[in-house]
Amino acid sequence: MQPDLHCRTLAAHTLKHFRALSPLTHCMTNDVVQTFTANTLLALGASPAMVIDPAEARPFAAIANALLVNVGTLTASRADAMRAAVESAYDAKTPWTLDPVAVGALEFRRRFCLDLLSLRPAAIRGNASEILALAGMALGGRGVDTTEAALAALPAAQALARQIDCIVVVTGEIDYVTNGQRTLSIPGGDPLMTRIVGTGCALSAVVAASCALPGAALDNVASACCWMKLAGQAAAERSEGPGSFIPAFLDALYHLDVEAANATN
């Protein structure tokens, strides 16, 4: 099953709807990327909320437009809060997204993520090694993102998408987005995106927010990947290194005009 190239015209249309809706996105993410994730969502036009206490996470997940669960700095108490939020989201039919950070290397988070899959995520976003591990096809590894690695993990992503009935994103130099039947590829970005902490985690938050939009979930999630790739390219052109890249990236998201980018490429 060969992937199709995602259409930037559709990404431009989806971004207009995203900014109009400004989805309230409940981010249960890791401690390292809280601020960057919130700023990424704000720059694109979404409304982030970082609610983590179990007593608050359960009711808040029911009123949010979308939920992100990122296990990067997972603890036992945080796992309890995340499960409570996911159960609430499931009952309320709030779409939720799983980011299974380092799931192949650590047993506690692997078991936790596998257990959560029964509560039907709308989307899963990970690098090649994470998707392979979650699909039960490989364990361990650092999860280095390369075009070859992401493409090699695509069959696992497609199988996982069919098994869970969700969208699976494998990120790398080229991102692959699949529902198990149809697969889209999103090239672009810049190597500087891998030289700062949080671009993948922030993408997961944008993917989660995009799942709140009406229409085809596959196209909405692929559009989210496209926005981040385009912003990364634009920011790299204005940056001298990782330190200047971060503010340039947020500015690029804020000023993102997919139609203009489409016309110049």
Swiss-Prot record:
Binding site for substrate: M50, G198
UniProt-annotated binding residues for ATP: R125, T171
Pathway it works in: Cofactor biosynthesis; thiamine diphosphate biosynthesis; 4-methyl-5-(2-phosphoethyl)-thiazole from 5-(2-hydroxyethyl)-4-methylthiazole: step 1/1
Magnesium keyword on record: yes
Required co-factors: Mg(2+)
Annotated Pfam families: HK (PF02110)
GO molecular function per UniProt: ATP binding; hydroxyethylthiazole kinase activity; magnesium ion binding
Alphabetic keyword roster: ATP-binding, Kinase, Magnesium, Metal-binding, Nucleotide-binding, Thiamine biosynthesis, Transferase
Gene Ontology terms describing biological process: thiamine biosynthetic process; thiamine diphosphate biosynthetic process
EC number: 2.7.1.50
Top-level taxon of origin: Bacteria
Catalytic activity entry: 5-(2-hydroxyethyl)-4-methylthiazole + ATP = 4-methyl-5-(2-phosphooxyethyl)-thiazole + ADP + H(+)
The protein's role, per its UniProt record: Catalyzes the phosphorylation of the hydroxyl group of 4-methyl-5-beta-hydroxyethylthiazole (THZ).
HAMAP family named among the record's database cross-references: Thz_kinase (MF_00228)
Record family assignment: Belongs to the Thz kinase family.
Protein name: Hydroxyethylthiazole kinase
